[in-house]
Regions:
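Active-site PLP attachment segment
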Residues: 173-192
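Active-site nucleophile and cofactor-binding loops and adjacent substrate-binding regions
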Residues: 6-13, 31-37, 60-63, 161, ...
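Short acidic, glycine/serine/threonine-rich loops at helix termini
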Residues: 42-45, 67-72, 136-137, 165-170
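Active-site core of PLP-dependent enzymes with the aminotransferase class I/II
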Residues: 107-114, 127-154
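Buried hydrophobic positions in well-ordered alpha/beta secondary-structure cores of metabolic enzymes
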Residues: 20, 43, 56, 100, ...
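Glycine-rich loop-to-alpha-helix module at the N-terminal edge of alpha/beta enzyme cores
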Residues: 1-54
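N-terminal glycine-rich dinucleotide-binding loop that anchors FAD/FMN and/or NAD(P) in oxidoreductases
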Residues: 72-103
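Conserved PLP-anchoring active-site segment centered on the Schiff-base-forming lysine
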Residues: 49-64, 70
Length: 192
């Protein structure tokens, strides 16, 4: 009861999950992970499973963890209006580059162009609602919500950094936009 658990949830984990569902606007269920990278990776995998689609859209400069999809295009590559996926580490399979599309942060017109071209293949758009120190432009997050709803694409908020820091309900509460999925880490686990 008070030791390590490898398969079964403890009462404390269930209580924490219930508190998270109460605090996080989009939360209906909780999957615990050991790291924020695992949380974002699980969210992407769930989006692919739910939609039956392969591709994801992320934003240039966003870091979603050290998994193959999270560490693409953390720095600028390609043109300003159409960045291209670029690995930030050796060992990322070229197939991953075919499954990830990249848009400039705060550019809804670019997102619309990409969705128009690839919408039927897009499982999810993953976004850090507050990209470290770059705030979302007015209407950007709600615009993403509208685009994803119109095209059957899941919207994922990477709240590993923003969760419980901007407000108890994270960026979802602060900006009034509710995604389909959210990934939390750092503060939720007692980290920095």
């Amino acid at each position: 009861r008070d030791g390590s658990a490898f398969a079964m949830l403890t009462e404390a984990a269930i209580e924490l999950a219930e508190a998270l569902v109460e605090a996080i606007p989009c939360a209906e269920q909780v999957l615990f992970a050991a790291t924020g990278a695992e949380a974002t990776h699980f969210a992407l995998r769930l989006a692919r499973a739910a939609t039956g689609r392969e591709k994801i859209l992320k934003f240039e400069g966003a870091y979603h963890g050290h998994h193959d999809y999270g560490i693409l295009s953390v720095t600028s590559r390609g043109t300003a209006d159409l960045p291209r996926p670029a690995p930030e580490s050796a060992g990322i399979p070229s197939r991953v580059l075919d499954e990830v599309l990249v848009a400039p942060f705060n550019d809804l017109a670019a997102v619309e162009r990409i969705v128009k071209q690839h919408g039927g293949d897009l499982a999810a758009i993953i976004v850090e609602p507050l990209q470290r120190i770059v705030e979302p432009a007015p209407g950007f997050l709600s615009g993403l919500r509208d685009i994803t709803r119109r095209h059957g694409i899941l919207l994922i908020f990477d709240e590993v950094v923003t969760g419980f820091r901007l407000a108890l309900g994270g960026a979802q509460e602060t900006y009034g936009v509710i995604p389909d999925l959210a990934a939390y880490g750092k503060v939720v686990g007692g980290g920095y």
